[in-house]
Amino acid sequence: MPTVTPVHRYARYVLDVSRLRVLDAFARLGSVTAAAKELHYTQPTVSHHLARLEAETGAQLVQRAGRGIRLTPAGQLLADRAAEIIGRIDAADAELTAHVGLAAGRVRLATFHSVIGSLVPRAVAALGERHPGLQIGLTDTQPPEALELLRSGKIDVAIIFRYDDTAPEPDDVRLHHLLDDPLYLLSNGDARSLASLRDATWIAGCDRCRSHLLSMCADEGFEPTIGYTSEDMVVIQGLVAAGLGVATSPGLALRAHHLEGIVASELPGAQQHIYAATYGEPPDPPATSALLDALAGAAASVSGGSPVRQTA
């Protein structure tokens, strides 16, 4: 008599990518409401997809938690894999689009303010001349968020900055060095060093910049008094020009915007290291490679020299 081996009900189903996208959004955002908003679904639709995914896998993926729901361990396991699956599918779609031809492809870029105002316009202009049909998607965000978008397959290239004391990026992220961007001390007077401003009110930037500022000041023997925080360099320069505080700024930001009344003095040895980051094994898709080449050219065109007039 033949032996019949019980088969779990999950074996009868193929995971639905649309439902995996719902699970991924719920895992990242933490609520049905937020997931529905991101995916442009109604809340009942999100709940339906989660329920169907449970029925198809035979696993409890979510459980009640107060007035809401949260992932179970099984749900978290599948959500982690869902992010990888979605990233691969989106990457495959982007590669196929690029393979059809750069004349009708699309490449997606995420980066931060100072690069958007300096390198990106030059790179996009050059790319447009070489490949006029290639579309560019642009997202304005800080390095940690840009890398998250990159690893989830939502973008093709992330331009990030690092300091010497920044923790290493994940192993599966490939970094392409673009340039080293000097840091400048901003004040509305003649301030030449961090130590000379130990008693000043400081304006801090993003988390990565704030940590580096604290580290630099600690090396000079003081802890800065931070009175304001902003990731917008226009806002930071406005506060400095009004005499409300002092700050540091990368040179690229000063190339993009330099408010009248601000004195910028280069900090010896202080730099942001600027990289274009890609994800996965080489080679990069043609559209991604074309963007990397354009970014390298733009970086070379702004490297060297000072973005500001140095004080006498």
Regions inferred by a protein language model and the residue ranges of each:
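A short LG(V/I)-centered, amphipathic sequence patch enriched
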Residues: 54-73
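Central regulatory/effector-binding core of bacterial HTH transcription factors
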Residues: 104-166
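Hydrophobic hinge/microswitch elements
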Residues: 141-155, 161, 208-263
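Flexible hinge/capping segments at coil-to-helix
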Residues: 170-205
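Beta-alpha-beta core module
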Residues: 167-177, 181, 234-283
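Short helix-boundary/capping micro-motifs
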Residues: 25-43
